[in-house]
Amino acid sequence: MDNRSRSSSLASNVRIKSYSSLSSHSNSNSNSNGRSIEAPAVRRPSDNLLASESKKNELDQDYLNAINLQNHTKSSSCIGSALTGHVVPVKERPISNDSISTRNTDLFSSTSIYTKNSSSEDIFNDGDSNGTDDTSNITSKPENCNYLLNRKESIISEGQITNSTPTPAPTPIPGSNNIYTHHFAPSNPLLRSKTALTPSQQYKLHRVRSDSLLRNIINTNDRNLFNSSNLILQEHDDEDDDNEEVQIDVNNNSLNWNVPMASVSTTSFINSVTNDTDIPTHVKKSKRKNHPTGLYRASTYTSSYTTINGRHTPSYVPESPYDIALPTTPIPGISNVSDLEYMRDTSKSLSALYLQSSGKLSESRLAQRTRSSSLLPLEFKEASDHGMENLLLVSNHKRSFTTTTRPCWLPPKDPMEIKSHEKQISQHLDEVSVFELQRNNSFQDHVHNNKVNQDRLQTIIDRGLTRNSSLKILKEIIWENSLPDDLRLSIWNEILQSSDNLISNNYIESFDSINEIYSNLQFPRSKELEIMKLIDKNIKSKYGDNLEISENLLYLLKLKSLSQQGLVTGDELLFHHFIYDKSFKFSLNDVWTMVNLIQKTCFNDICKDFYDHQIVNGNKVFAQYIGNNEEFSKENNSTCLNYGTLWNILERMDHNIFMWILDIIIIHNSQNFKNSSISKSNINNEITWDIYRTKNVVVNYKILLSFTLLILLKYHFGFNNLSELSLLNDKQFCIPVASKNVQDEWHFTSMFIRKWNYYYKKF
């Protein structure tokens, strides 16, 4: 028991002396049950040369054992024999730590960061781990910032006697190995030896361990800095590309927060345009020569060799934009470098790193945006075509603030404004979608009703059109569908003059007779010029390229001027449309007959007089909408509202709707010839046209008044009044709006007809 206590006291006092020598504390007292080992008097190193020569072989062997401290494993029974060995008196005074210089340049080697065998397990904490040690007599002193570099105890001072009561090992530091298992393991060669270390050996061991510890600290910090830099670079990439956040979970004490990161500027983007797209510029030798001094590649580019014509040609794999790292810097106080030189070199390295990485990052971003410029939204491409945008400067951040409702070169909208506008746009799109759906359904219903009405029309034709019941059905059908082209001419002819052709045979000059007169007469040149001016004014200036002017139009107008009725208002327009309509099959005889028939029945002098009188003064319905409305105060006169301005409206109608309008006007001027007393046998030379017109021709001026009222109330745009409508020089102006799409054209036309029917019922 006494031997065990004596050994424990010996180990405790040896550790106390070691602490005292490293912390500049002397004259420490040992435990009451042990004896202390006093340090020799202070001597110069030259006094110990002869004395230490005899111990050279033993010291060299112990020195090698200390270097290979972590590479040997032995039984734990050697600890006791190492502690009970003879202690050689100290005969050499160690030099101060301030004069210790780095003996191996590998300490700051650039490869130390990436050495796979190096780890942070050698970073340890030499705190008080022995619960049985008596340290009450040691004077405490605050540790300075060089704590890890200067606090090195003797190997013996950290040992414990295995035969004594075991003391629990200190709690290991997370991420590092337990120093207790390293230096108190049974395989420790120093604990295995029978002779204790001299103070000189302890000093050499202290230097070895200091270098090893410093190397491990630098490697660990550099490795942590490299890993954290990769995380920061990843965060920069994600923020620019995907707007994602990367959390950095590393030790904050191992990061250098003042290292500038690479950035992409507009100027560098514009100035970084290069023609070398196949091989990166940093691979070329000319570019490599311009690299800043001191920078090196964290991971060199990967090269492979391909065989071309028997030669090996290197092919390069592009590097990362951040594939640049700082060189290792000297440690002030350890390396032989002044503080000014250290700060100057570090500043140059940081500046070079920033410029180099920024240039590479700009080139990478420029190449990426050049490849993806074709995938940008259409508004950016249109702005680029107009010189208002550079596609290389469009980033994800700018795209997030750009909307289709505002050009990209204007200031961006406020987020609340964007949200409000998107909501309104969504509502309008919903309304348009519903409207389009309803219109499509309506067009499908129109196609179906058109087939049904054709069957009904064929039924009343077989039964007889001039019956009252047939005329009633026909007036219902005509507001839904126009007459078919193959039936239009026959229906018009039977409704206006019955199947006996009472008017054309008795009151209209035949086409052949007028043509014979024209062929035997030299037509006056002045009259021909007047007709040509009429065509230019009322036809050519109104329709543009919709319908070509036929050569037969001038010929038919010349014939009409030679007839008894002569040229009247609307002749040129009726001839022009009938020549191209499929219903007449390009028959000039039918065109001649039908134009004269319509002018004698639907647009005769009696209808004209009624229209001019009722539109200004007489009709109550027209006066209710127009006469009492202050907006039409300047138009409610005979100059703007007359029979001539009615044809100004018809001149602006498209061909299809013009024929449908004539269908409606003609059918509403029909009469029942079946119950009429007049017949082919009753007509003789004594019954003049005036007598026949008074007794047998229906004059429906109300259909014309309702038509004019519709234009004034619903389509009065693009002109000031109806008299100025003929002077409008826009050839594309049409009432209603013309469209080349069949569905749209039917929609506009059917809407116009429904509104006309609504106002006609008011009369």
Curated annotation (Swiss-Prot):
Q: Which UniProt keywords apply?
A: Cell wall biogenesis/degradation, Golgi apparatus, Protein transport, Transport
Which InterPro entries does the protein's record reference? Sbe2/Sbe22_C, SBE2/SBE22_M, SBE2/SBE22_N
Q: Name one GO cellular component term.
A: Golgi apparatus
In Swiss-Prot or TrEMBL terms, this protein is called Protein SBE2
| Region spans: Disordered | 18-48
- Function, as annotated: With SBE22, is involved in cell wall integrity and polarity processes like bud growth.
**Extent of Low complexity compositional bias:** 18-36
Q: Which family does it belong to?
A: Belongs to the SBE2 family.
**Location of the protein in the cell:** Golgi apparatus
Top-level taxonomic group: Eukaryota
A GO BP entry: fungal-type cell wall organization
